[in-house]
C-alpha cells in the first residue's frame, strides 16, 4: 500500500468516525433513558478520541510525503529534511529529552584543555553519519501499564500492544475450547453426567470469551494504521530481568466498572448480578461479591503469588443459572512493580527538587518545589550518607526521600472489548534484599557457563524463557518453559528437538563443514518481503514474537508465508516449500542409506582383499592420492588396527583444551586423515577427551565468553592453518579508512601465504627462560597513537603477554609471608594484607580456592586476569594496580599485588561528598587508566567505586581485573552477561553484542555517583535496577553546572554507537569535553597535579580505611578438605610468576 492509498484509507476512517458520532448525537436527543444516554456518551467520547488519532496520523503521513518530496528535489538528503523526518517518525509518546550529539563540542573550542595538543581534537576527526544520525531517537515516556489505562493519550502504541495480546489470547482460547470439547465427548462416552455438565458450562464460557476476543480484535484492527514507524520492539527481545515471573504478595482493590455491555435481559427483569473473578496463572485467587450497580465498597483482596507472570480480571454477568463473561483485562505483575518503582523515585526526586537534564540550569524551579536563593549549586538528598554538612538544598517543608511513602497504583483501566474498571494495586516482593537502593558495596554478577551441546555447528545451551516462544523446528510453543538456544545465532527449539536440527549454524564456515556430512540439495530460497504484522506471528528462527504493526522488523515469505525478523532472514535455510520435519526425515534416510552402503563396502573388502594387498601400494601413490581433495578411494585400504592406531596418534599429537568441540569427531574424517598421513600436528581435528591442554595461553576453561576469544579461534583453526585475525585499527594505520573492496583479496592472499609452521608466540615461549621486561618509563602522549592516512589516530597493537610467563623465575611461596588482616572478600576467595618475613614489605594478596575455580569453570578467567596484570605491569601504569608475584599451593592460587593503604572510593564517598574538583580529578585519572586498557585491547567491565583504590599520595589505582576481556579492539564485540548491576550498560541487559562503549557507560555512572553521591539508576533489587537502566531518565539538581550535565548525558546514552567514547578515537572524545577543560592530561599522567585529598593512616599496617566488616575477621586460611586430582592440578601449570621490580 503506497502513501496515496494510505491517505485514502485514513480519510475513509475519518468520515466513518464522524458519521458514527453524528448518529450517536441524534440518537441521544431522541431518548430519555439515562443508561442509553450514558452508553452513547461513552461512544461519542471514544469516537472523538479515535478521530483525533486518525487526523494526527493523516498529518504525519502528509508531512512524511512532503519530506520525501524535498529529498527528491535536492541532490542529497539535507539536514533539514533529516531532522524533519526525525520529527515525523517519532512515534506517539516519544517525548523524553534526547541527549545531545556526542561530537557536539565545537561550541567550546575556545576552552580546550591545556596541554592536550593534537590528540584531543575539538570534534571527532572521523566522518559523521547521516544528518540526523548523531541525535539518538527519543525514548518512550510511557509504560505498558499506561497503555492499558482507559484515558491513555498513547493510542497508537496501545493499538499495537493489544493487537498482539488479543491475538495470542484468542489462539490460546481456541486451543482451550478444543480440549474442552474432547472432554465433553469423553464424559459422554463414560456416562459421567456431573463432569459432563461442568465441562459443558466451561465450553459455553470459552465460546463467549472467543466472541469477546474477536470483537476486541476487530475493533483494534479497524483502528490500526499501516504506517512505517520505528516503534519499540518489546516482546521480541528476551530481557533477562523484565520477563521474569515474580513472587510476593499482591494487594488488589476493586472499586467499580462502567460502560460494559451487560448480558441481555427480558423487558421486566432486574439488572443482572455482576461479579469479577481474578485469576493468577489460570487459577482463581479472588472473587468479588455480586453487585447490581457496578460498584463495590470494600473489595480488598490480598493473596500470595509464586513465580507469576500475569493477573487476569474477568467481569461476569449472571442473567440465568450460569455466569457469562462480558469483559476482560490482563495485567502483568512486572508492569505493576515497574509503575510502583517509578512513582516512588518520582516522589523522592520531586521532594528533593531534582529535574531531568533539559530543565537543568533554568531559572524557574520545578513547580512542586519552591527553591530558595541560598541553595548551593547541587547537593545530595539528605538521606544519603555524608550529606549532613551540605543539607541546605532541601527546605524544611519538603519531606526527605526516606519519608516518602510509596502510593499504590490507582486508576481506570480499559476492559476488552468494551468498558473500564477502577482498580488499585500494590505489590510487595518476597525475599527482597536490603540496601540495594542506597549507595553501597554491591558484588558483580557474571553469567555462569552452561553445558554446550553442539549440533551442525550450533552451540546449544538450555535456557528458561519467560515469554511465549515457538520452536523453530516443530513449530509448537515452548510456553514458559525451558528450551535450547544457540549461543551464536539464537536458533531456538525444544529440548527434545535440538538433536533433530538439520541447518548449519551461520557461525560455522564452509571450511569447517565435514565433507561427508549429509546435505539436502533443496536450494529454493524464500522470498521475504516486509509486511505489517497485525496478528501474533513468531520468528521461524529465533522463536520470538514479531513486533506488531511495523514493517521495519517483520518479514514474510510471499511463497510459503513463513515469518521472521528482518535481522534473522539471512539465517533461515533455503527450504522454501519444505518443513523442517520433512527435511529431517530426508536427512535421516540419507544417513541410514550411507551407513548401509558403508557396512556393505567394508564387509566386501574384508572378504575379497588378500593380506598382501595392504603393502602393494607405494607410499608415493598414497601421497599422490592425498593431494586430491575429492579423492577418498584410499581411506578404506588400511587395516582397522592401523586405522585405530593412526587415529590414536592423531588425537594425541594435537593437545587441545577439554572444552566443548566446535566440530564433530566423526571416525570417518579421522580415518581419512590417518590414511592420508598429512602432518597430524597441524591438523584442526579436535582432541579426544582427557588430553592434556597446552598452557601457552590457551583458553576455554572458564572464560565467560570464550567463543569470542582470539585463543579459542586459533584452536578452532589449528596451529598450522592460516589464522583469521580480528579487526584492529592498528593493522590499517597506513590504509585509507574507506579503501576499495579490491584491496581485500590481496590481504587475504597474503594471510594464506603464511607458512604452515607459523605458531603464535605464546606457544613458542619457553617457560624456563626469564623474560626481559621493559624499563618502567612513563610513555609520552605524543607517541601513544599512530595517525592513519585517513587522519584517525589508532593505537598500536602490542603483543599479548603469556599466561605462563614466569617473570624472573624466582620462587615465592606461602612461607615467605605473614598474613596481618583481611581487606575484602569476593566470589571465590578474599584479599588479605601480608608482609614479607625478611624485608617486612606490605603486599595485598588475593587468595582463591582451586576447588571453587574448577567447580565454576573459571580456570581460563584466572589466566586472563594474570595476563591483564602483566599488561598493567608492562609500562607500570600509574593508575593501575601492579602485580608482584603469583604462586600456588595444592589448594589455592595467590596474586601478590601492591598494597594500597588509602582504601577505596566507596568508603571515602560514604564519609563525605567529593565536590566537583575532587570528582573531576579522580575521573581524569580513571579515564587515562581506561584509555590504556583500551589501547591494549582490554575492556574492564567492572568499573565502580569499590574497585578504585586511593594511594597515600592522593592518586587512584584501579584494581580487580577478574571481569576484564582481552582482544577487544575497536569494532570487536562480545556478549557475556556480567558486571555490577548499577553499572551495566543497556546493551548488556538486552543480551546484545557489545564492545568498548560499555566501559564509558560505567564511567558516566561513576562520575554521577562521585558528583551526586547516589546512583542514576536505583532500585530495591537487581530487577528494579535493570528496569531503571532501560527506562528511566537520569535526574539532576536544578542548578547543577551545565558542563557536568552535558558529559553525563553523552556518556549515559543508551544507543552504544551514539555514546561518547564509542568512536575509533575512544578516550579522546571524553578528554576533549568541556567538563575537563581545565585538565592538563600530561600533568595528570605524570602526577604533577596536587591531589585534592590525602588519606590518613596511623601506621603502615593501619587498615582503618577499609571496611570493618572485613578487617575484623581473623586473617587465617580456612582448611580445605577436598583433594584435587593430578588432572585438576595440571590446569594451573605455569601460573607462578615473579616481577622484576619490588
Curated annotation (Swiss-Prot):
In this protein, the active site sits at 942
Q: Which SUPFAM superfamilies match?
A: C2 domain (Calcium/lipid-binding domain, CaLB), Cysteine-rich domain, HR1 repeat, Protein kinase-like (PK-like)
Q: Segment Disordered: which positions?
A: 70-139, 357-403, 592-622, 651-807
UniProtKB keywords? ATP-binding, Coiled coil, Kinase, Metal-binding, Nucleotide-binding, Phosphoprotein, Repeat, Serine/threonine-protein kinase, Transferase, Zinc, Zinc-finger
Q: Which Pfam families match?
A: C1_1, HR1, Pkinase, Pkinase_C
Please report the stretch or stretches of sequence annotated as the Protein kinase domain: 817-1076
Biased composition (Low complexity) is annotated at 663-677, 712-724, 741-765
What this protein is called in its record is Protein kinase C-like
Amino acid at each position: 500500500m503506497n502513501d496515496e492509498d494510505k491517505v485514502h484509507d485514513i480519510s475513509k476512517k475519518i468520515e466513518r468516525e464522524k458519521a458514527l458520532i453524528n448518529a450517536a448525537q441524534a440518537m441521544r436527543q431522541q431518548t430519555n433513558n439515562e443508561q442509553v444516554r450514558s452508553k452513547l456518551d461513552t461512544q461519542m467520547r471514544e469516537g472523538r478520541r479515535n478521530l483525533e488519532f486518525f487526523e494526527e496520523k493523516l498529518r504525519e503521513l502528509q508531512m512524511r510525503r512532503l519530506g520525501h518530496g524535498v529529498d527528491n528535489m535536492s541532490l542529497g538528503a539535507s539536514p533539514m529534511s533529516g531532522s524533519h523526518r526525525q520529527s515525523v517518525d517519532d512515534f506517539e509518546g516519544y517525548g523524553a529529552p534526547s541527549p545531545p550529539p556526542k561530537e557536539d563540542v565545537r561550541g567550546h573550542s575556545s576552552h580546550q584543555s591545556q596541554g592536550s595538543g593534537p590528540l584531543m581534537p575539538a570534534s571527532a576527526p572521523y566522518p559523521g553519519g547521516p544528518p540526523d544520525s548523531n541525535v539518538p531517537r527519543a525514548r518512550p515516556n510511557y509504560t505498558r501499564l499506561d497503555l492499558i489505562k482507559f484515558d491513555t493519550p498513547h493510542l497508537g502504541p496501545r493499538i499495537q500492544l493489544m493487537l498482539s495480546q488479543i491475538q495470542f489470547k484468542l489462539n490460546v482460547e481456541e486451543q482451550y475450547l478444543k480440549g474442552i470439547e474432547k472432554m465433553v465427548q469423553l464424559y459422554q462416552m463414560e456416562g459421567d453426567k456431573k463432569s459432563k455438565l461442568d465441562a459443558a458450562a466451561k465450553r459455553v464460557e470459552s465460546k463467549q470469551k472467543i466472541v469477546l476476543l474477536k470483537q476486541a480484535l476487530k475493533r483494534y484492527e479497524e483502528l490500526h494504521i499501516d504506517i512505517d514507524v520505528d516503534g519499540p520492539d518489546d516482546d521480541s527481545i528476551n530481557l533477562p530481568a523484565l520477563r521474569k515471573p515474580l513472587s510476593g504478595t499482591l494487594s488488589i482493590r476493586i472499586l467499580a466498572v462502567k460502560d460494559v455491555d451487560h448480558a441481555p435481559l427480558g423487558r421486566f427483569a432486574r439488572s443482572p448480578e455482576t461479579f469479577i473473578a481474578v485469576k493468577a496463572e489460570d487459577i482463581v485467587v479472588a472473587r468479588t461479591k455480586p453487585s447490581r450497580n457496578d460498584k463495590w465498597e470494600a473489595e480488598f483482596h490480598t493473596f500470595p503469588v509464586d513465580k507469576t507472570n500475569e493477573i487476569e480480571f474477568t467481569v461476569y454477568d449472571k442473567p440465568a443459572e450460569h455466569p457469562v463473561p462480558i469483559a476482560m483485562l490482563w495485567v502483568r505483575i512486572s508492569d505493576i512493580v515497574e509503575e510502583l518503582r517509578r512513582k516512588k523515585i518520582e516522589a523522592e526526586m520531586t521532594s528533593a527538587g531534582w529535574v531531568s537534564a533539559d530543565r537543568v540550569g533554568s531559572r524557574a524551579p520545578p513547580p512542586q518545589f519552591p527553591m530558595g536563593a541560598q541553595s548551593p549549586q547541587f547537593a545530595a538528598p539528605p538521606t544519603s550518607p555524608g550529606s549532613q554538612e551540605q543539607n541546605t538544598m532541601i527546605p524544611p517543608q519538603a519531606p526527605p526521600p526516606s519519608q516518602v511513602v510509596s502510593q499504590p497504583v490507582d486508576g481506570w483501566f480499559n476492559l476488552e472489548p468494551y468498558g473500564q474498571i477502577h482498580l488499585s494495586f500494590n505489590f510487595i516482593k518476597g525475599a527482597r534484599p536490603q540496601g540495594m537502593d542506597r549507595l553501597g558495596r554491591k558484588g558483580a554478577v557474571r553469567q555462569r557457563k552452561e553445558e554446550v551441546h553442539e549440533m551442525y555447528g550450533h552451540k546449544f545451551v538450555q535456557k528458561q524463557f519467560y515469554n511465549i516462544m515457538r520452536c523453530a523446528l516443530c513449530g509448537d510453543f515452548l510456553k514458559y518453559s525451558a528450551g535450547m538456544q544457540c549461543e551464536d545465532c539464537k536458533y531456538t527449539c525444544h529440548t527434545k528437538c535440538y538433536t533433530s536440527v538439520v541447518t548449519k549454524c551461520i557461525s560455522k564456515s564452509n571450511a569447517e563443514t565435514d565433507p561427508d556430512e549429509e546435505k539436502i540439495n533443496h536450494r529454493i530460497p524464500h522470498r521475504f518481503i516486509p509486511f505489517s504484522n497485525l496478528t501474533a506471528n513468531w520468528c521461524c528462527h529465533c522463536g520470538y514474537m514479531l513486533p506488531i504493526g511495523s514493517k521495519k522488523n517483520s518479514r514474510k515469505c510471499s511463497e510459503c508465508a513463513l515469518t521472521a525478523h528482518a535481522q534473522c532472514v539471512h539465517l533461515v535455510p533455503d527450504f522454501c516449500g519444505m518443513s523442517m520435519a520433512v527435511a529431517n526425515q530426508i536427512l535421516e534416510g540419507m544417513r541410514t542409506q550411507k551407513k548401509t552402503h558403508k557396512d556393505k563396502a567394508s564387509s566386501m573388502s574384508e572378504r575379497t582383499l588378500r593380506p598382501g594387498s595392504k603393502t602393494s601400494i607405494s607410499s608415493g601413490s598414497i601421497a599422490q592420492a592425498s593431494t586430491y581433495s575429492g579423492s577418498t578411494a584410499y581411506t578404506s585400504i588400511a587395516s582397522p588396527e592401523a586405522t585405530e592406531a593412526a587415529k590414536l596418534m592423531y588425537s594425541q599429537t594435537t593437545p587441545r583444551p577439554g572444552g566443548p568441540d566446535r566440530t564433530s569427531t566423526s571416525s570417518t574424517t579421522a580415518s581419512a586423515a590417518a590414511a592420508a598421513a598429512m602432518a597430524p600436528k597441524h591438523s584442526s581435528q579436535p582432541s579426544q577427551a582427557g588430553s592434556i591442554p597446552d598452557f601457552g595461553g590457551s583458553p576455554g576453561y572458564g572464560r565467560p565468553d570464550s567463543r569470542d576469544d582470539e585463543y579459542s579461534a586459533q584452536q578452532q583453526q589449528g596451529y598450522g592453518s592460516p589464522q583469521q585475525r580480528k579487526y584492529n585499527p592498528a593493522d590499517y594505520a597506513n590504509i585509507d579508512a574507506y579503501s576499495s573492496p579490491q584491496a581485500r583479496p590481496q590481504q587475504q592472499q597474503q594471510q594464506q601465504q603464511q607458512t604452515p609452521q607459523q605458531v603464535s608466540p605464546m606457544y613458542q615461549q619457553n617457560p624456563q627462560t626469564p623474560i626481559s621486561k621493559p624499563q618502567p618509563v612513563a610513555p609520552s602522549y605524543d607517541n601513544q597513537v599512530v595517525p592513519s592516512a585517513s587522519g584517525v589516530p589508532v593505537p598500536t597493537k602490542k603483543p599479548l603477554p603469556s599466561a605462563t610467563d614466569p617473570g624472573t623465575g624466582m620462587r615465592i611461596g606461602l612461607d615467605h609471608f605473614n598474613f596481618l588482616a583481611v581487606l575484602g572478600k569476593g566470589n571465590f576467595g578474599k584479599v588479605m594484607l601480608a608482609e614479607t618475613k625478611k624485608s617486612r614489605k606490605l603486599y595485598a594478596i588475593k587468595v582463591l580456592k582451586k576447588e571453587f575455580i574448577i567447580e565454576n569453570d573459571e580456570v581460563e578467567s584466572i589466566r586472563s586476569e594474570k595476563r591483564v596484570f602483566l599488561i598493567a605491569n608492562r609500562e607500570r601504569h600509574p593508575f593501575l594496580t601492579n602485580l608482584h608475584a603469583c604462586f600456588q599451593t595444592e589448594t589455592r592460587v595467590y596474586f601478590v599485588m601492591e598494597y594500597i593503604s588509602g582504601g577505596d572510593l566507596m568508603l571515602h564517598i560514604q564519609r563525605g561528598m567529593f565536590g566537583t574538583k575532587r570528582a573531576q580529578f579522580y575521573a581524569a585519572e580513571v579515564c587515562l587508566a581506561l584509555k590504556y586498557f583500551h589501547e591494549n585491547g582490554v575492556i574492564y567491565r567492572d568499573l565502580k567505586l569499590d574497585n578504585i583504590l586511593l594511594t597515600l599520595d592522593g592518586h587512584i589505582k584501579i584494581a580487580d581485573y577478574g571481569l576484564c576481556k582481552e582482544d577487544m579492539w575497536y569494532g570487536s564485540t562480545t556478549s557475556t552477561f556480567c558486571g555490577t548491576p548499577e553499572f551495566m550498560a543497556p546493551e548488556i541487559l538486552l543480551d546484545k553484542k557489545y564492545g568498548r562503549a560499555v566501559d564509558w557507560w560505567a564511567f558516566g555512572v561513576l562520575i554521577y555517583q562521585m558528583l551526586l553521591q547516589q546512583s542514576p539508576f536505583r532500585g530495591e533489587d537487581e530487577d528494579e535496577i535493570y528496569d531503571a537502566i532501560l527506562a528511566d531518565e537520569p535526574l539532576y539538581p536544578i542548578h547543577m553546572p551545565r558542563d557536568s550535565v552535558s558529559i553525563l548525558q553523552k556518556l549515559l546514552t543508551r544507543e552504544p554507537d551514539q555514546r561518547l567514547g564509542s568512536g575509533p578515537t575512544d578516550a579522546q572524545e571524553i578528554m576533549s569535553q568541556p567538563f575537563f577543560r581545565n585538565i592538563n592530561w600530561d600533568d595528570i599522567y605524570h602526577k604533577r597535579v596536587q591531589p585534592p585529598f590525602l588519606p590518613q593512616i596511623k601506621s603502615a599496617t593501619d587498615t582503618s580505611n577499609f571496611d570493618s566488616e572485613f578487617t575484623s575477621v581473623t586473617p587465617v586460611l580456612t582448611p580445605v578438605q577436598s583433594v584435587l586430582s593430578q588432572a585438576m592440578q595440571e590446569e594451573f601449570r605455569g601460573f607462578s610468576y615473579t616481577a622484576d621490580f619490588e
